[in-house]
Amino acid sequence: WGIDLSSYGQRQLHRRLRFMMERAGDSDLDAFLEHLARNRELSVRLKDQFTINVSEFFRDAHLFARLETMLRPRGQCHGARKIWSAGCSYGAEPYSLAIMLKEHSPHDSWQVIATDIDRQILARARQGVFTERELRNVSPTRRRRFFTNIDDEQYAISPQLERKVKFSELDLLKPRSRPPGGCD
């Protein structure tokens, strides 16, 4: 797969591997490896166990603040923009970018392309539903403008932003992987 596992501790790797072996119904490593060789879906699920999905809205606030200063003042952004969010996880980062672009580009001549290796996490990202905790860095003004409260704990991204963010699967470490073209 080309995934760098050096940041994992050995116990953590063993725990995740044992979890997948149990789910697959295999009691020993040799049986599990044979099962992996025959079952592509199991192989994908194992890979997903070893990819970490960490994200939150406006995470690394200083970077978003810098990006915001780089965006032209409201009303001056006339050209089409295409922004790529690589390793987008469950969608908080690309939607954070979309919020900023919407605020600074009133003509909607922009799109965010969001990619990740994990199919399951992309499915969640496409749903556009986030918890109160995941929105902790989103101001009340932005919450009112860009989210709909579903219940006490969940919020849905607004349709105006949802249609501006396109999610797709991409493994950045595969030699033939190509980033989306035309991105700023």
Model-derived segments and spans:
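Conserved AdoMet
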Residues: W1-W84
